[in-house]
Each structure stands twice: as C-alpha cells, then as structure tokens.
A protein has these predicted regions:
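Short alpha-helical DNA-recognition segment
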Residues: 14-32
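Residues in the helix-turn-helix
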Residues: 29, 39, 58
Length: 66
C-alpha cells in the first residue's frame, strides 16, 4: 500500500506538506506511511481514500481502477 500512497499523491500533484495539513498529521507521519515504516489506521485509510478520490481496494492495491 505504501507505494500506492506515494503514487497517488504524486499523480494528484500534492506535496507532503499539503497532504499532512489536509489529514491533520505531521509530514513525518505521511512520509512514514509512504516509505512503509508505519501503517495507517483504518480511519486514516478512509481519509486517504476521500482525499485521493479512490476506493479502498485501489488504495490497498487490490485493483488498479480508481
């Protein structure tokens, strides 16, 4: 999932700082989600899905369709 998080952020032209502000977490937290050293909670996964306008299946890498 961590690769997908970074891929979606870059595709949507968001900077780490923007995502962190929108999700009310630190830049370091987003960075750790993206590099795989930390796993997001279910609540955070839902927030990512809403922010990036994708399904949970897409975010989790179960499907490629947005």
């Amino acid at each position: 999932m961590h690769e997908r998080l970074k891929e979606l952020r870059i595709e949507r032209n968001f900077k780490l700082k923007e995502v962190a502000e929108k999700l009310n977490v630190t830049i370091r937290t987003i960075s750790r989600y993206e590099d795989g050293t930390r796993e997001p909670s279910v609540e955070m996964i839902i927030k990512f899905c809403k922010l990036y306008d994708v399904s949970a299946d897409c975010l989790l890498g179960l499907t490629d369709s947005y």
